[in-house]
Amino acid sequence: PEQKNYNVIGFIKEHPTLFDDYKPGMSLDRLVNIVCNRLLNNPIDVRESRVVEPKRDAKPFNLSDYDILRFNPREKDTQRKHYPYFKERGINMRTQFAFHKQFFLATRHRTDGLSFANLAFPLSLPSKPDSIVGLEERGRPRREDGKAYKGKAEGSNSSEGLWIANLTGKPLKDSTNILWFESAYDAMAEYQINPVKSVYVSTGGTPTKGQIKGMLEETRQASHYLGFDKDEAGRG
């Protein structure tokens, strides 16, 4: 089994549910403050905890809110701009060429003047594979620690939307093999090892009932293969 070493603050933040003072949505820094003061028998500043509620009025996803740069197999400048997002994952150019229609760089329009481009894998519904209902996003690795942002674009339909890379040249309903993964990176890595023209699907995290149901309804004759990790998310 993997062994991890924590300091007190790291342990509290990694395992907040072990502490009675924790409430869903509360700031982890606030939790650390409360727990440490209790351990030291210091008086605790009693105040109403700030719980961050999910946005219920979030704006629906709209691709027009982004500037898009697509990977063009005939233009090296576009390939060069995508390169940093694939380098650390070891995804080679041949694999990028194979999937080039299924990803692009997306820069959100912002009012503060800042500009951040993410590698975006478009999410769609199996029943409407040509419509984009969100983005699975990956950022560039930071120089200081090598870590990178990962998530989904605001307003994405995460409960039903899937990244669907159909390399067969046939309609989705006629597909015979569907390969499932937790991320588009994982799907591309599998193809790089075993380059088979199948349908590659990413759930962008823990799979949902809506994602699975939607795909099964559209591919009733297909065989499905799971390439999920063996961690908690992959078993979800």
State each model region's role.
Residues Y6, I12, L18-Y22, Q192-G236:
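TOPRIM fold recognition
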Residues N7-D20, A106, L123-L125, P141-R142, ...:
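Short regulatory "switch" loops immediately downstream of catalytic or recognition motifs
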Residues P16, G90-T95, N194:
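Glycine-centered loop/turn motif at secondary-structure junctions
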Residues R110-E217:
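Phosphate-handling DNA/RNA-contact segment within nucleic-acid enzymes
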Residues P1-K87:
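Non-catalytic accessory segments of DNA primases and related replication-initiation nucleases
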Residues N7, K81, Y185, A189, ...:
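Short Gly/charged-rich anion-binding patches and loops
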Residues Y83-I91, F121-S124:
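Serine endopeptidase catalytic core focused on the charge-relay Asp
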Residues N92-L114:
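Short, basic/aromatic recognition patches
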